Swiss-Prot record:
InterPro entries per the UniProt record, alphabetical: 4pyrrol_synth_GluRdtase, 4pyrrol_synth_GluRdtase_dimer, 4pyrrol_synth_GluRdtase_N, GluRdtase_CS, GluRdtase_dimer_dom_sf, GluRdtase_N_sf, NAD(P)-bd_dom_sf, Shikm_DH/Glu-tRNA_Rdtase
Subunit structure: Homodimer.
Residues bound to substrate: 49-52, 109, 114-116, 120
Upper taxonomic lineage: Bacteria, Bacillati, Bacillota, Bacilli, Lactobacillales
Domains as described in the record: Possesses an unusual extended V-shaped dimeric structure with each monomer consisting of three distinct domains arranged along a curved 'spinal' alpha-helix. The N-terminal catalytic domain specifically recognizes the glutamate moiety of the substrate. The second domain is the NADPH-binding domain, and the third C-terminal domain is responsible for dimerization.
Name of the protein in its database record: Glutamyl-tRNA reductase
EC class (word): oxidoreductase
Gene3D superfamilies listed in its UniProt record: Glutamyl-tRNA reductase, N-terminal domain, NAD(P)-binding Rossmann-like Domain
Record organism: Limosilactobacillus reuteri (strain DSM 20016)
Residues binding NADP(+), per UniProt: 189-194
An individual GO BP term: protoporphyrinogen IX biosynthetic process
Site annotation Important for activity: residues: 99
Pathway of action: Porphyrin-containing compound metabolism; protoporphyrin-IX biosynthesis; 5-aminolevulinate from L-glutamyl-tRNA(Glu): step 1/2
Length: 421
């Protein structure tokens, strides 16, 4: 079996081409199932974002797996396989785990270190597992990758190094309030910046996120997409909404201010508009304009570079851990066999003991059973640890056969597998 990743991403493709090779959320489950029916594909998972469309797969042979994945994608997007192939990057074997760990931590993103990719990968994994297209290898790889990414986000405080003006504004609000529980945010103006800000704010912990746009239907559409804590408000209620929320982010494109703020207002305001959306009549306000936000972004550049390097330095060990696990897959039946063999002997000895000592009450029987199981587990703990270590050495097959003979498990036939099988 081989790991494989077939990728269409921003490194090779400009936006106008990436748009042609993307799946909608509704299409991904169907595509996962259809791809899984192709020859050579044992496991598969598909992810599609604005920066990449990728298939992660376990295939029985590299050349056939590569062909059928390419053919599937080419047919889906109505290309000939020859024309489609020039857009594709294929990664195989050891390099797949390294690639995934870079992608899921944001190191391979257009904006380095961006945290959204973790959520997108989690969603893709959940869809694939629900559709039944993943198995032992992809399940383990993606669970490990998700755990690793979460650990990196916590360890290096990734979310604090904002990557866009909207993210920087949200970070400033979080710094102001600490906890966002019970807080309400208004997002005014739903162009590219405002829309992305709304998407990011929707899962930050605000109790409500209120959307306002000069075209009310756009606010309603985005609120319907996001649901949860996100609600639309009519634009003619702007003044009332801003006065009653805890914080507001303005991101509209206007020539004249949309709102006048004086010292009577307690709302924290982040103004990303150029020209500014808010006319400020007091220096006492909690007000941040786009220059303040850019200062945050610029101050984070060096911190972000160091963060990215630190995360990159941790990836090789994570990759090594995965491939040690993969190499040990073939030893799983042996370990399971040893446990079952040992428990069977323990069970027979326990039954024999009860026949010889029928006067034992239920409590005494439970104590004896517990201690017998403990003895068995302690006895096999050492051998299991040793055979796991031996299973990744060049002479693994002979060692495993000898191990089985020692413990009376000659009936177990185990094939040695390495990275190339």
């Amino acid at each position: 079996m081989y790991l494989m990743c077939v990728s269409l991403n921003y490194h090779q493709l400009p936006l106008d081409l990436r748009e042609k090779f993307s799946f909608t959320k509704e299409e991904v489950p169907k595509a996962d199932k259809l791809l899984n029916d192709e020859k050579s594909i044992l496991e598969n998972l598909l992810i599609s974002t604005c920066n990449r469309t990728e298939v992660y797969a376990v295939v029985d042979q590299i050349h056939t797996g590569r062909y059928y994945i390419r053919r599937f994608l080419a047919e889906w997007f109505h290309y000939t396989i020859d024309d489609f192939t020039k857009f594709v990057t294929v990664t195989t074997k050891d390099a797949v785990a390294e690639h995934l760990f870079k992608v899921i931590t944001g190191l391979d993103s257009l904006i380095k270190g961006e945290p959204q990719i973790l959520g997108q990968m989690k969603d893709a994994f959940q869809i694939a597992t629900k559709e039944g297209t993943t198995g032992a290898i992809l399940n383990h790889l993606f669970r490990q990758a998700i755990t690793f990414s979460k650990r990196m986000h916590t360890k290096y405080r990734v979310s604090e190094l904002a990557q866009s003006s909207g993210q920087a504004g949200l970070h400033q609000i979080k710094m102001q309030f600490g906890s966002l529980e019970g807080k309400t945010l208004a997002v005014v103006g739903l162009g590219q910046i405002g829309k992305h800000t709304a998407y990011n704010a929707s899962n930050m912990g605000f109790s409500k996120v209120l959307l306002l746009n000069r075209t009310d239907s756009k606010a309603e559409q985005i609120a319907t997409e996001l649901q949860g804590v996100v609600e639309a408000r009519p634009f003619n209620q702007l003044a009332t909404v801003v006065h009653n929320v805890d914080a507001a982010i303005f991101a509209a494109t206007v020539k004249q201010p949309l709102f006048k703020a004086d010292e009577q207002i307690s709302t924290m305001i982040v103004d990303l508009g150029v020209p500014r959306n808010v006319a400020v009549n007091s220096t006492k306000l909690k007000y941040y304009d786009v220059d303040h936000v850019h200062m945050i972004l610029n101050s984070n550049d060096e911190k972000r570079r160091l963060m990215i390097q630190k995360i990159a330095n941790e990836i090789p060990q994570e990759v090594n851990d995965f491939y040690i696990w993969e190499k040990q897959l073939h030893i799983v039946p042996v370990i399971r066999g040893l446990r079952e063999h040992s428990l069977r002997i323990e069970g027979e000895a326990y039954d024999s003991l009860l026949r010889k000592l029928p006067e034992l009450d239920s409590h005494e029987r439970k104590v004896i059973s517990k201690h017998m199981k403990s003895i068995v587990n302690q006895m096999i703990k050492g051998p299991i640890k040793e055979i796991k270590e031996l299973s990744v050495t060049p002479g693994a097959t002979a060692d495993i056969d000898f191990f089985c003979k020692i413990f009376g498990m000659d009936n177990l036939k185990v094939e040695n597998q390495n990275n190339d099988k």
